[in-house]
Amino acid sequence: MAQINCIDGDLSGNLVRISNAIEEATKKLADIILFPESALLGWINPEAFRRASPIPGKESEIICQLARKYKIHICIGLDEKDGDRLYDSAILVDDNGNIILKHRKINVLPELMAPPYSVGEGVQAVQTRFGTIGVMICADSFRDNLLESMQKKKPDLLLIPYGWAAPENAWPAHGQELIKVVKKAAIKINCPVIGTNLIGQVSHGPWTGQIYGGQSVAFDPATNLLLIGKDRDKDLIIISLNLNN
């Protein structure tokens, strides 16, 4: 879990922090690294309508190059431009630098940005050498129907980039709510769930000023393994899992 500091609109700086986290993770022999939601431009940032790229495109190719360079699987949330539409997307890139899965967020919370993100269709999972890996994004994990759809795909691992924010005075307690959400998803789908949050602050829309407080969560229902990232500080959490592949 790469719980990094993401600064809204600081695309080049966020790429530096992403690259540094990947380099550190490979030194710790990680096979897969999971970053937060909208890790390049920031969640609910209307500037993304102008600055985001298609997928595949310029920014996703940089992620693919990093995967090839460091021989690691990367899952990351990226804003995706498709014509006039903007999607809150996530990609899974294999260690050869190929995008093997792209998910577009479905539960986009349209009241938080005008115009809002476009709504994705369906959940997906892909076969890898580690087993079947599914990907959802943040508030997708709130919806029972989406968890049920993912359950039917029988993933061995579910990766969820989060943008988990709350007012400053709600932290650190707000991290307990993320634990509940991740645990519920893991128990419902019957596989380990990894949820990576970021460090930062919402800078646009009605949630302006709210804090992304970290406390990323990994939970394995088979072993009751629970790992939690640092409160309101960057962290790189290494998890060892025996997947059912």
What are these regions (language model features)?
Residues 1-5:
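Short beta-strand segments enriched in small/hydrophobic residues
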Residues 11, 19-96, 102, 165-191:
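Cys-nucleophile CN-hydrolase/nitrilase-fold catalytic domain and related Cys-dependent amidase chemistry
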